[in-house]
Amino acid sequence: MKQNAIQPANLEFNAEGTPVSRDFDDVYFSNDNGLEETRYVFLGGNRLPERFPSHPRPLMIVAESGFGTGLNFLTLWQAFDVFVRDNPNVTLQRLHFISFEKYPLKAEDLRLAHQRWPELAPWAQQLQAQWPSAFGGCHRLLLDGGRVTLDLWFGDINELTRELDDSLNQQVDAWFLDGFAPAKNPDMWTQDLFSAMARLARPGGTLATFTSAGFVRRGLQEAGFTMRKSKGFGRKREMLTGEMAQTLSFPARVPWFARSSSDAREAAIIGGGIASALLSLALLRRGWQVTLYCADEAPAQGASGNRQGALYPLLSQHDPALARFFPAAFTFARRMYDALPVMFDHQWCGVTQLGWDEKSTHKIAQMLALNLPPDIACAVTAEQVAGLTGVDTGCGGITYPAGGWLCPQQLTAELLALAATRGLHVHYGYPVETLSAEGDGWLLNQQRYHQAVVLANGHRITGFAQTAQLPVYPVGGQVSHIPTTPRLAALRQVLCYDGYLTPQNPQNQQHCIGASYHRGNTDTTFSEEDQQHNRQRLIDCFPGAEWPQDVDISANDARCGVRCATRDHLPMVGNVPDYAATLTQYASLHEQPDIADSAPVCRNLFMLGALGSRGLCTAPLSAELLAAQMSAEPLPLDSDTLAALNPNRLWVRKLLKGKAVK
């Protein structure tokens, strides 16, 4: 995937108030009545909302080429909203809309365009509130409390459809083939696109498009659709509609990274931190019955128990998966945290990462080379750092304006309390020692049966026979709690250097400074040495500044925790792989990848772990991804990034090279 090379739409508004693309010399919607044209062509052409009452599944999936102003989406959402309000007991409960856009509108242009349709304002305002930054890849928006999911894929549709995971094959119930006219934008209307639409269309799925161009009709027929001409809208004589009347078959492209869903709709989660809490809500939203087993007597006693944690992305130019995953995870996390109906201490004050020596300065230069939008990350000079943060460091760096800090312990407790009101059953003080396969499900401690199980228990995730070989490791660390002083109180942003320092929490007038890093260590005993080390690192990184001397650790106030990490700094999200079967089945994978079967996994056993030091950033999208996978729903990441999150990845990479797995 070409990361972040996204240009915003170059448009103007004509005398009628219709947006017009300067680059394509074409209107975004009809000057006459764009709203009625959308209802006629795309909703009517796909027999929507007539199909809503008889839809056989809880989720309807609609895909579109060319999001533009979002008119098609908003019109469909309005119709869906009216339908579910009037028909609360039908099977169809949720809408998933997937759209591709090469040139996304700027937020202000989107708002101006929406003024043309006052009747869509209730839905348009929700979209505007979550409108994402313009960088490449998938932006998942959860709207209407999660009843409507919008996946906005920014980039070239002909490239993006090649990067979709196989799990989306034959899932789309209806296609809106939209975009600028074929004569104006021939690069989009390709046989590759038509073939991708056919691959993604569910048998019996439909499509509609405003054009009646012969090459479009023939191309869609060649791809597998049954096509017919219909009367066009208004002055347009004809349009095209189609149906996928056959069942096509498509071989898996990377079967060794295949993700298996679950036929169950009942699951146990083993954990008690932020990952468990977010996953509980994501599954409950999809209609699952969920039970949480926590070994501790209260939530967030592990790595999620800190008073202040920083929210910002891990950026890397060297690893494409990191470069794709973390911006998506960071922006999704902010959207989710902002939408939560719970209270927790937090400040979106920004985070600034400093180049305090030659190595860190070089690293920041590489981060900036990712060319993320400035509202995500941008360069700052030493003078700008002083202005932004309120303290003088003498260092420049990179700032994340949308970052900040939050209280993980509060957030986790509030999320689990919210989940309990939505049906979550919680058992505290219940350590799960063993997992035993029982039919298609699992027995916990030889006692409690569940149809599916998710392991989200931090560094203890390897404590089962099924996970003992996973290449993850614990990292112990101590965070120091220090009282504020007049000079420390001036700090307005989270500072990251060879450690981190938060602004004071107004609720307790304390800062957090940390954290020590002890790979392989699970000891949570207070360490005087770590306390001193946390203070000294701040002083050493900014030797010319006086204010770091104000850090007072004499009260020995600190918290020790244990993170779970991986060598490649990415979480493990997906099926628990079957270690022995993976080594046996893929012994000759490097010689015969073309005949490989799907990845061997432990049926109905999943994991969400190895979040390392960035769990606040990665847990929301990771939980959303796993809940979608378990429910056989569209996934919010491209296939390469999904492969990089697969718990079997480190083994499979070695096997693909013919190397031994140790």
UniProtKB/Swiss-Prot annotation:
Coiled coil: none annotated. Pfam families: DAO, Methyltransf_30. Its cofactor is FAD. The keyword tRNA processing applies. One of its GO terms (cellular component) is cytoplasm. The keyword Cytoplasm applies. Residues 270-662 are annotated as: FAD-dependent cmnm(5)s(2)U34 oxidoreductase. Its main location: cytoplasm. It is found in: Cytoplasm. Residues 1-245 are annotated as: tRNA (mnm(5)s(2)U34)-methyltransferase. Its EC number is 2.1.1.61, 1.5.-.-. It catalyses: 5-aminomethyl-2-thiouridine(34) in tRNA + S-adenosyl-L-methionine = 5-methylaminomethyl-2-thiouridine(34) in tRNA + S-adenosyl-L-homocysteine + H(+). Keywords: Cytoplasm, FAD, Flavoprotein, Methyltransferase, Multifunctional enzyme, Oxidoreductase, S-adenosyl-L-methionine, Transferase, tRNA processing. One of its GO terms (molecular function) is oxidoreductase activity, acting on the CH-NH group of donors. GO terms for biological process: methylation; tRNA wobble uridine modification. In the N-terminal section; belongs to the methyltransferase superfamily. tRNA (mnm(5)s(2)U34)-methyltransferase family. PANTHER family: SARCOSINE DEHYDROGENASE-RELATED, TRNA 5-METHYLAMINOMETHYL-2-THIOURIDINE BIOSYNTHESIS BIFUNCTIONAL PROTEIN MNMC. NCBIfam families: MnmC_Cterm, PRK01747.1-1, PRK01747.1-2, PRK01747.1-3, PRK01747.1-5, tRNA_MNMC2. Catalyzes the last two steps in the biosynthesis of 5-methylaminomethyl-2-thiouridine (mnm(5)s(2)U) at the wobble position (U34) in tRNA. Catalyzes the FAD-dependent demodification of cmnm(5)s(2)U34 to nm(5)s(2)U34, followed by the transfer of a methyl group from S-adenosyl-L-methionine to nm(5)s(2)U34, to form mnm(5)s(2)U34. This is tRNA 5-methylaminomethyl-2-thiouridine biosynthesis bifunctional protein MnmC. The lineage of its organism: Bacteria, Pseudomonadati, Pseudomonadota, Gammaproteobacteria, Enterobacterales.
